[in-house]
From Swiss-Prot:
Subcellular location: Cytoplasm
Reaction(s) catalysed (UniProt annotation): (6R)-5,10-methylene-5,6,7,8-tetrahydrofolate + glycine + H2O = (6S)-5,6,7,8-tetrahydrofolate + L-serine
Feature type site, description Plays an important role in substrate specificity: 234
Family the entry assigns: Belongs to the SHMT family.
Superkingdom in the source lineage: Bacteria
UniProt modified residues of type N6-(pyridoxal phosphate)lysine: 235
Taxonomic classification: Bacteria, Bacillati, Actinomycetota, Actinomycetes, Mycobacteriales
Official protein name in the record: Serine hydroxymethyltransferase
EC identifiers of the protein: 2.1.2.1
Organism: Nocardia farcinica (strain IFM 10152)
PANTHER family recorded: SERINE HYDROXYMETHYLTRANSFERASE, SERINE HYDROXYMETHYLTRANSFERASE 1
InterPro entries tied to this protein: PyrdxlP-dep_Trfase, PyrdxlP-dep_Trfase_major, PyrdxlP-dep_Trfase_small, Ser_HO-MeTrfase, Ser_HO-MeTrfase-like, Ser_HO-MeTrfase_PLP_BS, SHMT-like_dom
């Protein structure tokens, strides 16, 4: 029995579980050989992979540094304190909780800390770019709270702050949420703050998508305006799949209690270590350069997708451009629906996701739009030349201007020109 246990404990993944190892090898090959343009995805640095695959996964640590419910937490206390302090410094926040396992759990904790069941919540309509946790009826947020929604105008597809104010004055919400899952423009945090103050509401900003841009100083920061800010640590931040809450100090105790024991038990210390690494990287000039390329790439993509060949096919860019890392493509007047557009690009080696557009006539599993992001390719090393090439490939594909095999060859050449995870040998994951 002892020999069997020792053998299992010391075997590599490839030796112990070849089926799983093969699936992981396939994913590594997919990421290397295709172009990842799902706006919520990114590639983590090697150091983040190392932190997540460390012995910290072994340690239970319910509670917070200095106030744990388990012994032996002296090292994980150091880890969590590093992550908290780095997050506060990076975003200029008074308080940080780095324990949420995901963005959705961070959002649940925010709402638990600020609201009681039945209280009123005002957020961006899911169909207009909001997130599930901002009041979607099947989500906990839609079931626990009385939800009111604002949207975008039919004319320019931008949030109308006069409408937000009108709805807020009528609904008198306890919490107003700004932030989005699919919206290509900056939001006016000062205007949201003024409306929240006028109606006596808390202001919560979900910056999951644009946190990396904020960290780099390339997007207006919500931190000076919001009572509470939540985020994921992946997406533009490029860290592990996980959540983060920032707040003014007066909300610290309630937020800590809402995370633990309100939403979670033991924190994932290996993930918190990976967050600490990501926050350190996000303070570097290299990271800022990456965010510059992310923005530049999105603008190049938006400009190409407004070209005559694309417009002639009834395809347009929502709001006419972008301020962030993503472009929303409107297919309502074209021969394509969102599912067909996603499949067409997948066939040539570009991964995007179909996405509803405001006032979408099609069902959510089909949609009339595409959400295309540039963060992962910027992390990979793409600059303006590469983004110009991939933008032309996408535009040509959607407009039907070339055959799939030719376009797949262009994608393959780009992937080879800017290789992914060089030096990260397969044994690191599979050996």
């Amino acid at each position: 029995m002892t020999q069997t246990t020792a053998s299992v404990n010391t075997q590599s993944l490839g030796e112990l579980d070849p089926e799983l190892a093969a699936a992981m090898a396939g994913e590594l090959a997919r990421e290397r050989d295709t172009l990842e343009m799902i706006a919520s995805e990114n590639f983590v640095p090697r150091a983040v992979l190392q932190a997540q695959g460390s012995v910290l996964t072994n340690k239970y640590a319910e509670g917070y540094p200095g106030r744990r419910y388990y012994g032996g937490c002296e090292n994980v206390d150091v880890v969590e304190n590093l992550a908290r302090e780095r997050a506060k410094e990076l975003f200029g926040a008074e308080f940080a909780n780095v324990q949420p396992h995901s963005g959705a759990q961070a959002n649940a904790a925010v709402l638990m800390s600020l609201m009681d069941p039945g209280d009123r919540l005002l957020g961006l309509d899911l169909a207009h770019g909001g997130h599930l946790t901002h009041g979607m009826r099947l989500n906990f947020s839609g079931k626990l709270y009385e939800v009111h929604s604002y949207g975008v105008s039919k004319e320019d597809h931008r949030v109308d702050m006069d409408e937000v104010r009108t709805i807020a004055l009528g609904a008198k919400p306890k919490v107003i949420v700004a932030g989005w899952s699919a919206y290509p423009r900056h939001q006016d945090f000062a205007a949201f703050r003024a409306i929240a103050d006028e109606v006596g509401a808390y202001l919560w900003v979900d910056m999951a998508h644009f946190a990396g841009l904020v960290a780099a100083g390339l997007h207006p920061s919500p931190v000076p305006y919001a009572d509470v800010v939540s985020s994921t640590v992946h997406k533009t931040l490029g860290g592990p799949r996980s959540g983060l809450i920032l707040a003014k100090q007066e909300f610290a105790k309630k937020i800590n209690s809402a995370v633990f024991p309100g939403q979670q038990g033991g924190p994932l210390m290996h993930a918190i270590a990976a967050k600490a690494v990501a926050f350190k990287i996000a303070g570097t000039e290299e990271f800022r350069d990456r965010q510059q390329r992310t923005l530049s790439g999105a603008k190049i993509l938006a400009e190409r997708l407004t070209g005559a060949d694309v417009a002639d096919k009834g395809i347009s860019v929502l709001t006419g451009g972008t301020d962030v890392h993503l472009v929303l493509v409107d297919l309502r007047n074209s021969q394509l629906d969102g599912q067909q557009g996603e499949d067409l690009l997948h066939e040539i080696g570009i991964t995007v996701n179909r996405n509803a557009v405001p006032f979408d006539p099609r069902p959510p599993m089909v949609t009339s739009g595409l959400r295309i992001g540039t963060a992962a390719l910027a992390t990979r090393g793409f600059g303006d030349a590469e983004f110009t090439e991939v933008a032309d490939i996408i535009a040509t594909a959607l407009a039907g201007g070339s055959d799939a095999e030719t376009l797949r060859g262009r994608v393959r050449a780009l992937a080879q020109r800017v290789p992914l995870y060089q030096g990260l040998e397969d044994w690191h994951l599979l050996g």
